[in-house]
Amino acid sequence: MSTTRHTITVWQNAGQRAMAMDILDEEPLAIRVQGQPYAVVMRTPGDELAHAAGFCLTEGLVDRPEDIVNLAACNTDDTNVVTVTLTPQRRDQIAGHLDRRGYISQTSCGLCGKTLIDEVMQHLQPVQSDVTIPLAAAEQCLRNLDQFQPLRRSSAASHAAALFDAELNPLVVMEDVGRHNALDKAVGRLFLDRRLDLAKVVVMSSRISYELVQKTVRARIPIILALSRPTRLALDLASRLGVSLAGAAKPAGLYIYCHPQRFVELR
């Protein structure tokens, strides 16, 4: 569990007291591709190889595990570094992409400095899937997400990304200070295990940003469920790329924002 115990001062009922609290860790992860710095992301330490693999997939650097010749972590006192070596063929295919290195990701925004939706659309193919899930079961996945969030229970500061199969069986759950990092870690874990094709549903503890839609499309997952609502750009991108978006309604139920055909009511 990546937290650090810290003593804080609590002010309640006109009085003060000291209390120990678990604070979520946040550190930089440098991702090097072909021996050159490519990205620095601020994240919760842990699952570095899965994180880097998922980042490379969802950012378009790789399409298959076989595109990666070597994936290795190097830990030092000051930072964490993961090096990614691609096959010569893949390196040549994405030479222009590699020239855009210098991606800096903050925990609140994984697309800092990136171009907007029109450029994103040029590099993505719509998701084609006839998978359907029951409405009630989809809502239950959202309501039960906190059961898979030990970091959130201890720190109250992390996001979670959970991937489910077509029968809504959980495949992997990852937590991180950044919602996009949590998704990269979850996708990367299944990608390295060669099980990503089983994933049909993403469940997020956060709002749905267009970056999360982009990453989900790269992973070829047709459905996103989230506790909070999507942004307008996220909804636009999902509508155009065939991803179903739904979120938790209050006090119960679902808000279905686009492609509702994948949600069915069992009778």
PLM region spans:
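Intrinsically disordered, low-complexity regions enriched in acidic/Ser/Thr/Pro/Gln residues
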Residues: 1-161, 165-166, 170-173
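A short, polar/proline- and glycine-enriched secondary-structure boundary/capping micro-motif
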Residues: 50-52, 94, 182-185, 267
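Phosphate/diphosphate-binding glycine-rich loops and adjacent basic-rich segments that engage nucleotide
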Residues: 109, 266-267
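A mid-sequence, solvent-exposed acidic-amphipathic segment
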Residues: 144-205, 212
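Feature captures the catalytic cores and cofactor-binding loops of soluble hydro-lyases/lyases
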Residues: 180-265
